[in-house]
Amino acid sequence: EAPANAVAANDPTAVALKYNADATKSDRLAAARPGLPPAEQHCANCQFHLDDVAGATEEWHGCSLFPGKLINVDGWCASWTLKAG
């Protein structure tokens, strides 16, 4: 179950970035983001992903694009960029 401060599907930023808490339900192929094949792109391997934020759980972490909110580590958005390292 999503925490209270999870990014909502109707959040304006989420809509603009085509965020989906389940990457398999997003159109990763159409976005053509470089770095990894679309099927391997998800929030946990994105440079904007933040591990250490208030309220984070194993499944829900922070994202610098959604301050104060949590994203699903298995999610995806159109700003996905491969994490360095």
Swiss-Prot record:
[4Fe-4S] cluster binds at C43, C46, C63, C77. Keywords: 4Fe-4S, Electron transport, Iron, Iron-sulfur, Metal-binding, Transport. It comes from the Bacteria. SUPFAM superfamilies: HIPIP (high potential iron protein). Gene3D superfamilies: High potential iron-sulphur protein (4.10.490.10). Pfam families: HIPIP. One of its GO terms (molecular function) is 4 iron, 4 sulfur cluster binding. InterPro entries: High_potential_FeS_prot (IPR000170), HIPIP_sf (IPR036369). GO terms for biological process: aerobic electron transport chain. Homodimer. Belongs to the high-potential iron-sulfur protein (HiPIP) family. Specific class of high-redox-potential 4Fe-4S ferredoxins. Functions in anaerobic electron transport in most purple and in some other photosynthetic bacteria and in at least one genus (Paracoccus) of halophilic, denitrifying bacteria. This is High-potential iron-sulfur protein. The gene is hip.
